């Protein structure tokens, strides 16, 4: 019988849960409005629900009245934003994911030691903008192997590399290999800076790909890790669609006769996954559902001390 194979783990990670709860608890404690620098996570369902509760999402701190509370999103901010918040008398609450903070700390430490940092990631992504702000004159962002080949440093220069936490493990591995080939002495962290949730969701998806011929990745188009999941499937020759609403699950699926894989990005609510699953079962009523467990997750991050 044809079936849906549902990846596990999928959806919310510990950093996303912490960020959302930070906004919710702040609203409960202090009432509306609570200002949030950037979307707290990259999913419009989450953002819309928090906006209904009284969160106001802004990009410029000038939009925040003096002496108000402002929450920094899970993606992190550059030091200049923290300084501006302090100068304007804002009460800052930091919802930056702890794994992103770890990368910030490493960059600061190695920059102070005199290293030039190679930052692997999407240069326009808010996480990369935040990390780069730690030492802008000592950081070069690279997105691909061609940019590695164009780097101006010598093999003897003191270099250190880290990655955006939500990259494709496949792409990151290729870029790192190119870096190490050019710069055998380059340093990095003892463990990957791609976060555990990104690795687990990509691993869970890779695990089911030999069994399916179509994959739905439930997630927002703005979500880096959701887009990377789609690319993981496509890189292995499996058709994949990134959808964020059941209306986007269309009759296109009727063209495919094999099993269907479903996963979800780290900022995707489970109720959206279930709604897409129901739509799929309406289109193909005789589908069975099988859960494929890749690894159990039990990571929990504490809320900011202000809460």
Swiss-Prot record:
InterPro entries attached to this UniProt entry: LytB/IspH (IPR003451)
Cofactor: [4Fe-4S] cluster
Pathway: Isoprenoid biosynthesis; dimethylallyl diphosphate biosynthesis; dimethylallyl diphosphate from (2E)-4-hydroxy-3-methylbutenyl diphosphate: step 1/1; Isoprenoid biosynthesis; isopentenyl diphosphate biosynthesis via DXP pathway; isopentenyl diphosphate from 1-deoxy-D-xylulose 5-phosphate: step 6/6
BP-aspect Gene Ontology terms: dimethylallyl diphosphate biosynthetic process; isopentenyl diphosphate biosynthetic process, methylerythritol 4-phosphate pathway; terpenoid biosynthetic process
EC number: 1.17.7.4
NCBIfam families: ispH_lytB (TIGR00216), PRK01045.1-4 (NF002190)
Amino-acid positions noted as binding isopentenyl diphosphate in the UniProt annotation, renumbered to this chain: 42, 75, 125, 223-225, 267
Lineage: Bacteria, Pseudomonadati, Chlamydiota, Chlamydiia, Chlamydiales
Binding site for (2E)-4-hydroxy-3-methylbut-2-enyl diphosphate: 42, 75, 125, 165, 223-225, 267
Active-site residues, as the UniProt record annotates them: 127 (proton donor)
Function text: Catalyzes the conversion of 1-hydroxy-2-methyl-2-(E)-butenyl 4-diphosphate (HMBPP) into a mixture of isopentenyl diphosphate (IPP) and dimethylallyl diphosphate (DMAPP). Acts in the terminal step of the DOXP/MEP pathway for isoprenoid precursor biosynthesis.
Source superkingdom: Bacteria
Name of a matching Pfam family: LYTB
Entry similarity comment: Belongs to the IspH family.
Enzyme class: oxidoreductase
GO cellular component: cytosol
Gene this protein is translated from: ispH
Residues that, per the record, bind dimethylallyl diphosphate: 42, 75, 125, 223-225, 267
Co-factor: note: Binds 1 [4Fe-4S] cluster per subunit.
Alphabetical keyword list: 4Fe-4S, Iron, Iron-sulfur, Isoprene biosynthesis, Metal-binding, Oxidoreductase
Name by which UniProt lists this protein: 4-hydroxy-3-methylbut-2-enyl diphosphate reductase
């Amino acid at each position: 019988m044809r079936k849906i194979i549902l990846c596990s783990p999928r959806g919310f990670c510990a950093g996303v849960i912490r960020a959302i709860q930070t906004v919710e608890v702040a609203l409960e404690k202090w009432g509306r409005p609570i200002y949030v620098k950037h979307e707290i996570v990259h999913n419009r369902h989450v953002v819309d629900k928090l906006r209904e509760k009284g969160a106001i999402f802004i990009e410029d701190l000038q939009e925040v009245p003096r002496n108000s509370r402002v929450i920094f999103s899970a993606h992190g901010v550059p030091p200049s934003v923290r300084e501006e918040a302090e100068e304007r008398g804002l009460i800052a609450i930091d919802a930056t994911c702890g794994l992103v903070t770890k990368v910030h700390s490493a960059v600061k430490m190695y920059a102070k030691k005199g290293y030039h940092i190679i930052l692997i990631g999407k240069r326009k992504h808010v996480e990369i903008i935040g990390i780069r702000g730690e030492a802008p004159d000592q950081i070069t962002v690279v997105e691909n192997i061609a940019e590695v080949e164009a780097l101006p440093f010598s093999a003897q220069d003191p270099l250190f590399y880290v990655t955006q936490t939500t990259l494709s493990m496949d792409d990151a591995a290729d870029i790192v290999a190119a870096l190490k080939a050019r710069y055998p002495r380059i340093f990095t962290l003892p463990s990957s800076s791609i976060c555990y949730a990104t690795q687990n969701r990509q691993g869970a998806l890779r695990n089911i790909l030999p069994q399916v011929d179509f994959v739905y990745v439930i997630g927002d188009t703005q979500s880096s890790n959701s887009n990377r999941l789609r690319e993981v499937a496509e890189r292995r020759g499996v058709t994949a669609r990134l959808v964020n609403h059941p209306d986007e699950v269309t009759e296109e699926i009727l063209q495919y006769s094999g099993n269907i894989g479903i996963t979800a990005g780290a900022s995707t609510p489970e109720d959206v996954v279930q709604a897409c699953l129901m739509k799929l079962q309406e289109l193909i009523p005789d589908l069975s559902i099988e859960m494929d467990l890749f690894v159990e997750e039990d990571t929990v991050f504490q809320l900011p001390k202000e809460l």
